[in-house]
Amino acid sequence: MKNTNDPKILREIYAGFIRIHILYHTAKRPFYGQELKEELEEHGYRLSYGTLYPMLANLESEGFLERKDINTEGKIRKYYNITDSGRTLYEKVTDKLKELNREIFE
């Protein structure tokens, strides 16, 4: 995500978009960090694990995600899933995005 040529406000907006993507994908099924990173890269976001994991930890500490550690092939993977509070937040955000989309593009 970090591009030192981007103004700070643009990086903050992108960080918000990334959080929305995280909520969207974890509402569909649990994801672990590497999967989320790869998914976000498909959307054009370049971010390090040093950026992603603090975002996930913050969403978890705020009660929007829950984490479950699962042993997979001898590795402990941290799977993240959206909570009820996360779904409520996601719905509020998407309502605002729809409103913004109408204003800008219609």
Which ranges hold each PLM region?
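Short, Lys/Arg-enriched N-terminal segment that forms or immediately precedes the first helix
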Residues: 1-11
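Basic, amphipathic "hinge/linker" alpha-helix immediately C-terminal to the N-terminal HTH DNA-binding motif
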Residues: 76-93
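Beta-hairpin "wing" of winged helix-turn-helix
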Residues: 62-75, 81
